[in-house]
Amino acid sequence: MLRAPSRFVRSWITAAVVGSVLAGCGSSSGEPASDKARPAAKTDVTVDPIKAATELTDTKGVKVSLKKEPERIVCLFALCDDILTELGIVPTATNSALLAHPDFLGEEKAKEVDVIPGGFIAPEVEAILSHKPDLVIGLGDTHGKLAPALKGATTFWAMQPETWEDSVGYLRDLAALTGRTAEGEKAEKTFRTKLAAAEKTPSGKTALIIYGSDENFGVATPESDVAASLFPKIADYPWKSRGVEGSYSLEEILAQDVDVLFVETLSFGDADGKLSQKLARNPLWSKIPAVRNGDVHEVNPEVWAKGRGTRSLGIVLDEATAALR
């Protein structure tokens, strides 16, 4: 019986992936997969004006204070890169491969952005500071430990996105701090409009997003996976977080009659095969309707698992709605 990893295992798995990391599996819930999520509220396409600021309390209650608009920003995880791209800003240095995606900078221009050595889990402080950043943005539960070493030399902002609403909030916050208010409002409007359009014609199909590098796969749940938080609006998505120790077996997934599967393969160094290919070794895999009908989609993990921002989520919506038709 194959089981998805716990939050601890997921954090360990994704921390080993070069470039970025998924957030953990989320808040506790002992409810079974058959418990349907509550109907998602309709997306409001109204965008409130963004006011430029040098000090603010972010969408998660963290206080951020700068002396002036930041010009040199170092990104330690992909949401930062996503937001900066939406705002028309290129990071001074990054720790993500997202910028190489054609809908971001593309491979050639992305090569011009310096990469912070040390990997996602342990970016080198000296390398970060060598870029003389005005602002360093990282993932709270991974990079928060860097705060003492960066204190006094730069401003460190720890983000912790769990839902698409969080990502929109961070977009607005960074737009305010950089003075790119018009760009922020435009990006938010574009995303909200796309999401509202997608939810007007939801699919009746049952969908599932899984992630991992081997048979110990994980299930992305709407409570704390940003891409998955979109799915209750556009499909039947009956997967809920089971907390730190929770997991889903392949038998449970089979029982849900999944029509469309989205697979995020998280590789360790050199690619050693797709997750869907590895799961195919289990005889239960072939019995899942999505597998049987050829509706398994290997997606780009840089966008689906790591991007988290409005540009990445727009791509997720485009790809997901096309597959769910």
Walk through the language-model features, giving the residues of each:
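Extracytoplasmic substrate-binding proteins
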Residues: 145-214, 295, 303-325
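Extracytoplasmic ligand-binding site segments that recognize negatively charged/polar headgroups
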Residues: 99-104, 143-145, 160-173, 206-228, ...
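Proline-aspartate-enriched helix->loop->beta-strand connector
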Residues: 125, 129-138, 155, 253, ...
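A short, structured surface patch at a secondary-structure boundary
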Residues: 72, 77-127, 131
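Short helix-initiation/N-cap motifs at beta->coil->alpha
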Residues: 59-61, 116-125, 242-249
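Structured C-terminal subdomain patch of bacterial secreted/periplasmic proteins
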Residues: 185, 260-325
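Alpha-helical, coiled-coil/dimerization segments enriched in small aliphatic residues
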Residues: 98, 218-246, 303
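Bacterial Sec-exported substrate-binding components of ABC uptake systems
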Residues: 2-79, 182-208, 267-277, 299, ...
